[in-house]
Amino acid sequence: MIQSRRSFLKGVLALPLVVPDRLAWALPTNAESVVSPNGTIRFELVHGKNSPVKYQVKFRNRPVIEPSDLGLLVRTQDAPDKPSQHVARRTGPYAMRESFPTRGLRSIGVNQCNGAYFEIEGDAKYRLEVRAFDDGIAFRYLDEGDDTPRVPYELTTFVLPSESVVWFHDFQGHYEGVHARKNISEVKDGEWAAPPLTVRLPADVGYAAITEAALMNYAGMGLRADGRSGFKLTLGDQLPVSYPFELRYGLSEAKRLSQPAAIRGAIKTPWRVVMIGKDLNALVNCQIIEAVSPAPDRKFFPLGVNTKWVKPGRAVWKYLDGGQNTLDGMKEFSRLAGELGFEYNVVEGFWQRWSEAQMKELVDYANGYKVGTWFWKHSKELRTPYARRQFFELCNRVGVVGAKIDFFDHEAKEIIDLYQSLLRDAAEHQVMLEFHGSNKPAGENRTWPNELSRESIRGMEASRMTERAQHNTTLPFTRFLAGPADYTPMHFGERRRETSWSHQVASAAIFTSPLLIYAAHPRNILDNPAVELIKNIPSVWDETVVLDSSEIGKLAAYARRKGTKWFLAIMNGPSPRKIDIGLDFLGRGNRRAVLVRDDMSEPAAVKIEHTTAHDKTALSIEMRSGGGFIGMFG
């Protein structure tokens, strides 16, 4: 629904009285708005004769984004000035109502929004496209341009309501940081936030998160605090150099990538996304990132995410829990993967010491156990079309089905372009990918279904990680909002720190990753008392429900369905607790249940219970500090 001030009162008269949120809104002078299909979310564009264009976002008549700057400057030089004025007019209102197959949180995605274009004039001239969804808003800048190299510079800011609480980490570890929780008044000028930035809105209004989607032919974004409740969108060349990038590539390469990238032809920025929900369930289930990302190319993916050669699955991995870096060692891992019913074995870089005959020997051996093989590769070795073609042709020759590409660690346009080239070239050879040392996801897995997952998270590889329980119960409501993450969950040794075995098993069912790589040695999984339940945890889900008892940094409780089977998975934070959980999500009928509980006397043990349950059952669950619970209902 698109409204101007002149038509607003006329529109109100036609509204049913059962939607009071709509009736309370009054637009300021010289304002245009785009309203979500259900009327609860409004994007307002405010402009005056001699003032810059600003926007604001409201949810149920309460502010989510306070009046904030926006704008796109395009220059042939890299030091643009602020525009003196903008004047806006609205064009082309439209509505979208569609569904599409997806994977991860759910099997069906929905794109329902109202949209409009706004022509912006003044010192800069461009189009602003806005879409309002029932779970947030998205906007982007469009500039037709010509073949002259031009450098884009954005004025976009996100000013949050006072009394908001935010969760974010900086760029020191690129996207492998630990989230801080701060009142917005405590965030200082110059602090950096790596998206997504999660927000708890004041007065129990709900939650929001800020990130981007459909990132291509453009630099990735970060957020820089202004010390006044605002965050300024900052492009990749201006972001601080991360420790991983400096370690792997050096400061001279970082300096080179700090030069703003010029774009030839039309400029289409990524969508700037504000996810909005009344609770954590609504926030986690927000579908905007996928909805605004381009659909997959039917040339490569005739059935989209269901294309035959693109197969999500679970994987064993020799890296964090013993094993041999040898051909025989990898044969053992593949055999054990088959015993677990897992689909893949991810082989680290030592495969490069083998001959092609040895590579094929492993692949053929693994195939005998219905286990596919993935190879690791350094991204610096795949910078040219020739190098990519050589590698993917090797994968085809020896039968490798997927590649784990590592060490990107930068949001510069050059690196974003590399992701796109890798995904396209891999698709041409029908090779699946996952990225490590990577940037946040931004909808790439919708456009390129051969991207199964990416790291961009502080996961089990972080051997010095402390306070893992608090970290793990924060991640589902922060990093995972942007998309799947390869945390490499479930370790039964010292890396689990203060978390229990039950917590570790539950993490595999909560941390979404269509390529679900397990940290534990497969023998240790087979020897665990919970192995029969672990074997049944899928890597993709048909439905995800975040339960009301969830609280960021304290408790993550998910009910998830695959087919007719439900899982209840809970990770507890630092404080021991006892909670009661109703099983109304099960629907009618009795179900056989397997419950894995904390052993309250020993964190490195579990208690297994076999019982029956139905939708009227209420489970009483006691968890230790860093504890957990997981139940399977067949």
Positions of PLM-derived features:
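N-terminal secretory signal peptides and thylakoid transit peptides that target proteins
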Residues: 1-16
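C-terminal segment of N-terminal export signals and the immediately downstream linker at the start
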Residues: 20-37
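N-terminal accessory beta-strand-rich subdomains and adjacent acidic, glycine-rich linkers
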Residues: 33-293
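Solvent-exposed beta-strand/loop surfaces of large extracellular or lumenal domains
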Residues: 105-107, 169-176, 595-616
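An acidic-aromatic substrate-binding cleft motif
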Residues: 267-280, 287-330, 340
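Aromatic- and carboxylate-enriched substrate-binding clefts and catalytic-loop regions
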Residues: 350-500
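Carbohydrate-binding surface patches
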Residues: 551-589, 629-630
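C-terminal beta-strand-rich structural cap/linker in extracellular carbohydrate-active enzymes
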Residues: 612-634
